[in-house]
Amino acid sequence: MTALLIDGNALSKTLRAQAAERAAALTARGHQPGLAVILVGANPASEVYVRNKIKACEDNGFFSLKDAYPATLSEADLLARIDELNRDPKIHGILVQLPLPAHIDSHKVIEAIAPEKDVDGFHVANAGALMTGKPLFRPCTPYGVMKMFEAHGIALQGANAVVIGRSNIVGKPMAMMLLDAGATVTICHSKTRDLAAHTREADIVVAAVGKRNILTADMVKPGATVIDVGMNRDDAGKLCGDVDFAGAKEVAGYITPVPGGVGPMTITMLLINTIESAERAAAAA
């Protein structure tokens, strides 16, 4: 058996076209969706992510604003800028690129963003709303994974799902979304005693820890769906995920590649969240 590839680029293209249509409709009514992205410091990876987000906005009819600050920016000044953006009616989404310099409390910064503009879905109010099954925004990466399941008709109700990783950005919200869809969910992490015992029983495995080959072919149930959220480099410097792709694709039923799998979906769902925020603002105007 060779797994069917879940192509994040193709699905992302379709969803971005839909987002562009919604953006055009809003703009025609005088409510162009707007996203503000804040970058503090000169982290090369963060600069690439921010550039990709801004380009996605420009390509799909969104207004975008990039604030780039030196790593010496004070926490107080960053919080003051967020307050300004909270009150700016042209801005429907505010994103602070993580990680932040050590002297800035990222939790305090995230909580400073107005929940109705927290398009990353990280604010405690939005995390709590997700927990209760009534989310205002869903964190972009797990939201994108759910869209992948939907697009490929992968049944979640009654499925055994394992999420490897417990971060607030991917692991925990991914588990909640799967649970809300009717899956039986197990969260595994660095303290899990026998990871393979869990994954071999799973119909769905989502690997999201940032560790190469955390999931190998012998750990995959035949026909399972394997979602690789990891972003790593192999010994040759080539981009790879958390899954041993070459081995796992011979056992799994569906699998996402790296690159070209989950990655493109993350920015796409950021656009979708921003559109939803703009539509709510327009309806309330």
From Swiss-Prot:
Belongs to the tetrahydrofolate dehydrogenase/cyclohydrolase family. GO terms for cellular component: cytosol. Its EC number is 1.5.1.5, 3.5.4.9. It catalyses: (6R)-5,10-methylene-5,6,7,8-tetrahydrofolate + NADP(+) = (6R)-5,10-methenyltetrahydrofolate + NADPH; (6R)-5,10-methenyltetrahydrofolate + H2O = (6R)-10-formyltetrahydrofolate + H(+). PROSITE patterns: THF_DHG_CYH_1 (PS00766), THF_DHG_CYH_2 (PS00767). InterPro entries: Aminoacid_DH-like_N_sf, NAD(P)-bd_dom_sf, THF_DH/CycHdrlase, THF_DH/CycHdrlase_cat_dom, THF_DH/CycHdrlase_CS, THF_DH/CycHdrlase_NAD-bd_dom. It comes from the Bacteria. SUPFAM superfamilies: Aminoacid dehydrogenase-like, N-terminal domain, NAD(P)-binding Rossmann-fold domains. The lineage of its organism: Bacteria, Pseudomonadati, Pseudomonadota, Betaproteobacteria, Burkholderiales. One of its GO terms (molecular function) is methylenetetrahydrofolate dehydrogenase (NADP+) activity. Disulfide bonds: none annotated. This is Bifunctional protein FolD. Catalyzes the oxidation of 5,10-methylenetetrahydrofolate to 5,10-methenyltetrahydrofolate and then the hydrolysis of 5,10-methenyltetrahydrofolate to 10-formyltetrahydrofolate. The keyword Nucleotidyltransferase does not apply. Gene3D superfamilies: Leucine Dehydrogenase, chain A, domain 1, NAD(P)-binding Rossmann-like Domain. Keywords: Amino-acid biosynthesis, Histidine biosynthesis, Hydrolase, Methionine biosynthesis, Multifunctional enzyme, NADP, One-carbon metabolism, Oxidoreductase, Purine biosynthesis. Pathway: One-carbon metabolism; tetrahydrofolate interconversion. Homodimer. The keyword Hydrolase applies. It comes from Burkholderia orbicola (strain AU 1054). It holds the Pfam family THF_DHG_CYH. NADP(+) binds at residues 165-167, 190. One of its GO terms (biological process) is tetrahydrofolate interconversion.
